[in-house]
Curated annotation (Swiss-Prot):
GO cellular component: cytoplasm
Entries under SUPFAM superfamilies matching the protein: Adenine nucleotide alpha hydrolases-like (SSF52402)
Domain of life the protein comes from: Bacteria
Descriptive protein name: NH(3)-dependent NAD(+) synthetase
Encoding gene (name): nadE
Binding positions for deamido-NAD(+) per the UniProt entry: 140, 173, 180, 260-261
InterPro entries the UniProt entry points to: NAD/GMP_synthase, NAD_synthase, NH(3)-dep_NAD(+)_synth, Rossmann-like_a/b/a_fold
Annotated family: Belongs to the NAD synthetase family.
Binding site for Mg(2+): 52, 165
Catalyzed chemical reaction(s): deamido-NAD(+) + NH4(+) + ATP = AMP + diphosphate + NAD(+) + H(+)
UniProt xrefs under PANTHER family: NH 3 /GLUTAMINE-DEPENDENT NAD + SYNTHETASE, NH(3)-DEPENDENT NAD(+) SYNTHETASE
Organism: Lactococcus lactis subsp. cremoris (strain SK11)
Entry EC number(s): 6.3.1.5
Pathway: Cofactor biosynthesis; NAD(+) biosynthesis; NAD(+) from deamido-NAD(+) (ammonia route): step 1/1
Amino acid sequence: MTLQEEIIKELGVKPIIDPKEEIRVSVDFLKDYLKKYPFIKSFVLGISGGQDSSLAGRLAQIAIEEMRQETADASYKFVAVRLPFGVQADEEDAQRALAFIKPDVSLAVNIKAAVEGQVAALNEAGVEVSDFNKGNIKARQRMITQYAVAGQYQGAVLGTDHAAENITGFFTKFGDGGADLLPLFRLNKRQGKALLAELGADPAIYEKVPTADLEEGKPGLADEIALGVTYNDIDDYTEGKVISEDAKAKIEAWWNKTQHKRHLPISIFDDFWK
């Protein structure tokens, strides 16, 4: 088995999907979790305005609405959380996403004071915080906030990790990589777009240039520039297609470099890293 085949098997990506069928798979997955753990009464998700959170958010809202209808339990809620750092340049995109998702509850928590306070405390202790490191602090603060909200709403936190992101490790460890459920796992970027189109999303949501937007020195830096490879190549790779040797080498280098992000903390019984 080639490395490409091993990766595809681990990520569970299908070369061809039926968007309507995959929507039902994700919705049922979320509902099954609620049925298994009846003390969980909500799903919580941070909404950035990009493709991934828009899709995960809409799927979660559908699942919650179906649970309310099937159980007659009005306490089930989907909570969407805006998590800007100061004034968010793409706030209009976030509002467009919220209009599409139609969440039961919409909150906004500005993380700037918390992040700046953490950086100041580190500086006071003699620790210099690089722009890159501060970006990771932002991602982790956003998850701290979502788990606090989940505590209020008896909720589980959703993540937006998908195959095209997972393969490159393009997420912050214990930041946006930390969640309870991943309804998009198994889908690559273009498949996520197909689901959004099937759900009737404004094309502006899934045509937006993907960016983590964590570094202040590189505002709006496109994911593809940061990775050095296009999502089209990543998607082709995860679908088992032949791509250029250069793109293939970059993707596989990211996979190998970020293995630690796809595992729980390493114990003496783990050997994937050796």
